[in-house]
Amino acid sequence: MCAKQQQTLLPTRAAHGRLHRNRDAVAWPFSTLCRVSGPTLFQMTFTAALWVAVFGKCGPPPAIPNALPASDVNRTDFESHTTLKYECLPGYGRGISRMMVYCKPSGEWEISVSCAKKHCRNPGYLDNGYVNGETITFGSQIEFSCQEGFILVGSSTSSCEVRGKGVAWSNPFPECVIVKCGPPPDISNGKHSGTEDFYPYNHGISYTCDPGFRLVGSPFIGCTVVNKTVPVWSSSPPTCEKIICSQPNILHGVIVSGYKATYTHRDSVRLACLNGTVLRGRHVIECQGNGNWSSLPTCEFDCDLPPAIVNGYYTSMVYSKITLVTYECDKGYRLVGKAIISCSFSKWKGTAPQCKALCQKPEVGNGTLSDEKDQYVESENVTIQCDSGFAMLGSQSISCSESGTWYPEVPRCEQEASEDLKPALTGNKTMQYVPNSHDVKMALEIYKLTLEVELLQLQIQKEKHTEAH
């Protein structure tokens, strides 16, 4: 009997005689039910009733971030296996959770609730402006701004807030509208190209002056902004001032009609030349719209072009009453004659010089020159005289050619043969007259040179004969 009651009514003994809650079992202190008295049995019965009351109870609904129970908010305890539904706070949405809590038999709440901030729609791009913000979730704020030259029309901020069952931006998105300048300023004696009442940012206009006036300053101004949004014209407009030409000043020239102390646009004068000069250009000139005279003439001494020279050139300088021309020669040529000629009263005075080629001094060994100089000019002749005991091989007279070389070639002075060797030069037998082999060799060399000279002379004569015919 005692064993049966122990199996049916009593839980397992608790260690150290204390009451414990351990999942689905409760234990309290007693040794056996075989020997119980009345008070002891009452105590055991009360404890069993208390165990039934405590086991499986959950406390108030748990506090979950951004969520609240859908019902039974004020209850403080719930039976085991109780299920409570939760709802997300406004501005938050459920994820993949079941959105409920469950009271487990152990008296603990099992939570399956998750709420996250909802997203407002992406604001996208703002034409001609900027959208700044870190997130677009519930509670966040974005700011709007415009590029330079544009004005923000609408609110500069918008917040993601609750709207009905969802979230939306608190303010409509603004626009960036281009700024416009008013009419450009007018100018005296001129006008601008604008025809509108208002001109958008970066739009420009140009100014022109009336006839007889010229523009001072930049002809262009544009619509711009200060502080990024205040429209202003970029600069002050130009001005138009009356066109004035200075007195025409022409060397050797004079105004014969139309003289004024001040000349304005389209005024004209007639000019003439003095001192025997001739007018080159138009006699009548006009004050132009740019403040300059139309092509000014010149008064020149009416000489033809100075004569050109071969292998040389000239430079000219015009003075008050005379024109001077200076001649110079190319490299390798020397000026022969006066280097300067002049034009006065339409006539050249003096003869143009010549540029003649330069030949270097001929080098002749064992001989002398008829005229010794470091350089010789074209067509200049030189005669060569061989020293005593030397015979000339070549032409005695040579001339400086236009190419700067001597013609014919510079001759040579060779040592004459002795009396004993003269028969060798005439072609006679030599061995009976020559004392030794050295003299024989020299005689043969001299004879060879003589033949070469004679051959050269024959060729020259032949060429001259050919040129003559």
Swiss-Prot record:
Sugar-modified residues: N74, N227, N275, N292, N366, N381, N428
A single GO BP: innate immune response
InterPro entries attached to this UniProt entry: C4bp_oligo, Sushi/SCR/CCP_sf, Sushi_SCR_CCP_dom
Signal peptide location: 1-56
Keywords: Complement pathway, Disulfide bond, Glycoprotein, Immunity, Innate immunity, Repeat, Secreted, Signal, Sushi
Annotated S-S bridges: C58-C103, C88-C115, C120-C160, C146-C176, C181-C223, C209-C240, C245-C287, C273-C299, C303-C343, C329-C355, C359-C400, C386-C413
Principal localisation: secreted
Residue span, Sushi domain: 57-117, 118-178, 179-242, 243-301, 302-357, 358-415
UniProt subunit comment: Homoheptamer; not covalently linked. Mouse lacks the beta chain of C4BP.
Protein role: Controls the classical pathway of complement activation. It binds as a cofactor to C3b/C4b inactivator (C3bINA), which then hydrolyzes the complement fragment C4b. It also accelerates the degradation of the C4bC2a complex (C3 convertase) by dissociating the complement fragment C2a. Alpha chain binds C4b. It also interacts with serum amyloid P component.
Protein name stated in the entry: C4b-binding protein
UniProt source species: Mus musculus (Mouse)
Gene this protein is translated from: C4bpa
